[in-house]
C-alpha cells in the first residue's frame, strides 16, 4: 500500500514538472514531410479540405512537429493542413507545436514546398 502511494506521488511530481508546450509560427512550405508521407498530402483529402475550409485558418488546430537534431522541423500530424496553407496562402505563417526532439537530422527529407501540387 505504501509503495502504491509513493508511485502516485512520483507521477504527480512528474506532471507538475512537464516541459511547457512550445509554439512557433513558421512558413508551412519549409516544414519537412514525414517519412510516412514523402509524396506529400493525399490529393483527395487536400481537395476536400480546400472545398470545406478554403484558405481560412479559423479554428484550425496547430500542426504537430518534431525538431530534428539539425534544428529542422518535421511534421508529425498536419501534412494536409500545412499543404493547404502553403498552396492557398503563400508567405503566411502557420502555428506549429513542437512535441519532441529527434536524434536524427531531418534536412534530407522533402519539404511541403517541394511537393506542392
Where would I find each of the regions flagged by the language model?
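An acidic, glycine-rich, mixed-charge low-complexity segment common to nucleic-acid enzymes
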Residues: 1-23, 32-44, 109-117
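Short alpha-helix boundary/capping and kink motifs at helix termini
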Residues: 17-76, 86-87
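A short, basic-hydrophobic beta/loop patch
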Residues: 59-116
Amino acid at each position: 500500500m505504501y509503495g502504491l502511494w509513493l508511485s502516485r506521488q512520483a507521477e504527480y511530481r512528474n506532471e507538475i514538472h512537464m516541459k511547457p508546450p512550445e509554439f512557433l509560427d513558421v512558413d508551412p512550405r519549409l516544414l519537412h514531410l514525414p517519412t510516412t508521407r514523402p509524396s506529400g498530402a493525399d490529393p483527395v483529402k487536400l481537395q476536400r479540405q480546400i472545398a470545406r475550409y478554403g484558405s481560412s485558418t479559423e479554428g484550425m488546430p496547430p500542426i504537430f512537429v518534431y525538431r530534428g537534431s539539425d534544428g529542422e522541423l518535421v511534421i508529425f500530424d498536419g501534412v494536409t493542413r500545412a499543404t493547404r496553407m502553403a498552396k492557398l496562402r503563400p508567405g503566411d505563417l502557420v502555428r506549429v507545436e513542437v512535441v519532441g526532439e529527434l536524434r536524427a537530422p531531418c534536412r534530407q527529407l522533402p519539404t511541403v514546398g517541394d511537393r506542392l501540387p
